[in-house]
From Swiss-Prot:
SUPFAM superfamilies listed in its UniProt record: L28p-like
Species of provenance: Nitratiruptor sp. (strain SB155-2)
Family membership: Belongs to the bacterial ribosomal protein bL28 family.
Biological processes annotated in GO: translation
Protein name in the entry: Large ribosomal subunit protein bL28
Cellular component annotations (GO), alphabetically ordered: ribonucleoprotein complex; ribosome
Entry-linked Pfam families: Ribosomal_L28 (PF00830)
Length: 67
């Protein structure tokens, strides 16, 4: 399953977990992705994966969003 926002293009990035002893282990920072149903201007409905920021963008552009 893809972890990429279809509106903003956000995707996972890599980094480290850092312990108190300063040991580092690799980890992934995942975007906050949700599947929502969007009503397009022509009246059709489509399911897309969006991040929290992408959801705000869709609402500001007056798309009908069903969670």
């Amino acid at each position: 399953m893809s972890k990429k926002c279809q509106v903003t293009g956000k995707k996972p990035i890599t980094g480290h977990n850092v312990s108190h002893a300063n040991n580092k282990t690799k980890r992934r920072f995942l975007p906050n992705i949700r599947t929502v149903r969007v009503t397009l201007p022509d009246g059709t409905k489509k399911k897309i994966k969006v991040s929290a920021k992408g959801l705000r963008i869709l609402k500001k552009k007056n798309f009908q969003v069903d969670l």
